[in-house]
Amino acid sequence: MKRCRSDELQQQQGEEDGAGLEDAASHLPGADLRPGETTGANSAGGPTSDAGAAAAPNPGPRSKPPDLKKIQQLSEGSMFGHGLKHLFHSRRRSREREHQTSQDSQQHQQQQGMSDHDSPDEKERSPEMHRVSYAMSLHDLPARPTAFNRVLQQIRSRPSIKRGASLHSSSGGGSSGSSSRRTKSSSLEPQRGSPHLLRKAPQDSSLAAILHQHQCRPRSSSTTDTALLLADGSNVYLLAEEAEGIGDKVDKGDLVALSLPAGHGDTDGPISLDVPDGAPDPQRTKAAIDHLHQKILKITEQIKIEQEARDDNVAEYLKLANNADKQQVSRIKQVFEKKNQKSAQTIAQLHKKLEHYRRRLKEIEQNGPSRQPKDVLRDMQQGLKDVGANVRAGISGFGGGVVEGVKGSLSGLSQATHTAVVSKPREFASLIRNKFGSADNIAHLKDPLEDGPPEEAARALSGSATLVSSPKYGSDDECSSASASSAGAGSNSGAGPGGALGSPKSNALYGAPGNLDALLEELREIKEGQSHLEDSMEDLKTQLQRDYTYMTQCLQEERYRYERLEEQLNDLTELHQNEMTNLKQELASMEEKVAYQSYERARDIQEAVESCLTRVTKLELQQQQQQVVQLEGVENANARALLGKFINVILALMAVLLVFVSTIANFITPLMKTRLRITSTTLLVLVLFLLWKHWDSLTYLLEHVLLPS
């Protein structure tokens, strides 16, 4: 396992950052505590603090400690502790002002009929409704893991902690020290095998560490792990983070391991949480639910539209397929399959979105709206300057070598802190403030190694080493480095009033006889936390084994599917080869058939040609015979001439006869033109007929009548 990155900070950066440290010291802020907290601090340990301020002069130069790394850890813990104080104090005051104006803004919105997420006040105090760089709207937030929801539910269900049982409560003489309530450490999962991997001691077994697999960007040369060991007495607050990895995790809502401290703060009353997790804003929840309902309705309408479009495509395909030929049907089918596949993919995506929105709606109805970064920490640069000033003031009692070591570690620490914290959402800051009560409490952490007896300091240091000792370290050097970090976290200089080194309050705390029992109790809690971590590791191993089994099963199924596909491919190949063989055989048989048919056709054509030649020969013979007959008919030409002349004579006679007939007809025709002529002609003919018939009688009569005389 790798060592902490803070142990690897070298002294060669000291000269580089010396000027920056001196500039940061010039911005040392004054007393920035609220009146309630100042009163509580004075009421809890007023006599002790006054006595310590009077009895503790400004310490002179001390001898150089034997281990420079331990002193560097002390200075780093003091620096970042006071920086967190000034960082979260201003944020807490702004949250209080926002909380005071929330009721008036809500009433004003109800009177005007404005929606809950459209009002500027609600946009200012509800980070979920902002459009920030992490998610464009509330409904584009990534769904939090169910394990993290369980942790938040358990945190919300815990009772409020009174400040009366603070760690700083002590007697006036310092001999009768009371055992304080121990706080749990809240930590984020360090990246890439940090030595502070989930080293925390929760009291509640249900708040065990939740290991979450998360892929983050690889470390660059400029990003360093920042290990913050904030210790009050024998309590260890471990905040191990990686600048880019943790920023990505917090942006995505992947807060890995959170635990609520049992009690921390001054003796002036209960810890004041700005916005309790258990009581979300009902109007904001209602607005989120309404917005999700609108999105669900919109997605449902889109699904209906896509389904109707797909049905129309099917109907159009059937209509076109009935009126097309085979080639057009194949083309139409390809186009339809593409359209159908695209619409199916669109419908599947819409269904996924619908299920996602329904899960988020159910989650919001159960746990309230999920948090989102409201504002970037605007005063982070000033806080970092205050950190440098506080480090300079806190380590003023040490030798020049200590200052050089702190200067060397300040550059990398401030760079990593600025990179990590500025990119974090506001939820991370509020969670840290809820865990530690108020960030101002860090200023009350004193250094037991400054003014106490050497044996008490050694005992406190050994107790801290006992607290952080764990089999997770690979060597004694790493363990000693972590021990120095744990002990140094309690040596916060405190830049506020009364924040001088070597406070008698801390000496009384660490010199009390009851601290041994408290240390044993803390060690017991750490062992319990380690057991919880081991259980979580076992659960993770079980999950990994389950995933491995599932992947193995999937691989076996894919292998079986691959074998089946290979068998099908082999069968298809054999079938293809058989079909090719059959085609070759059919081609050979067809060739034989074509050759036979062509031979038969040629033979038929030959026979037809021979028959034609025979007919031509017969015609030639007939023509020759006719020519012979014609030659024989020339001899009878005279007889034929006589016959012709006789026929001509007969024709001439017939012509003469016809002339006579025509002449007679010409005489008769005028007599037959009218009815009168026809009648007279008929009578004349009858008379002539009668005369011809009685001609003998008429002649006899004429002879006897006319010729009697």
Curated annotation (Swiss-Prot):
GO terms for cellular component: endomembrane system; endoplasmic reticulum; endoplasmic reticulum membrane. Residues 491-500 have a biased composition (Gly residues). The modification Phosphoserine is found at residues 6, 438, 464, 470, 503. Keywords: Coiled coil, Endoplasmic reticulum, Membrane, Methylation, Phosphoprotein, Transmembrane, Transmembrane helix. Residues 115-131 have a biased composition (Basic and acidic residues). Residues 1-143, 158-202, 444-500 are annotated as: Disordered. It comes from the Eukaryota. Residues 44-57, 102-114, 480-490 have a biased composition (Low complexity). May be involved in the regulation of the proteolytic processing of the amyloid precursor protein (APP) possibly also implicating APOE. GO terms for biological process: amyloid precursor protein metabolic process. Belongs to the TEX28 family. Residues 83-94 have a biased composition (Basic residues). Residues 333-368, 514-633 form a coiled coil. It is found in: Endoplasmic reticulum membrane. May form homodimers and heterodimers with TMCC2 or TMCC3 via the coiled-coil domains. Interacts with ribosomal proteins RPL4 and RPS6. Interacts with APOE and proteolytic processed C-terminal fragment C99 of the amyloid precursor protein (APP C99). The chain crosses the membrane at residues 649-669, 682-702. The modification Omega-N-methylarginine is found at residue 163. It is a multi-pass membrane protein. Pfam families: Tmemb_cc2. This is Transmembrane and coiled-coil domains protein 2.
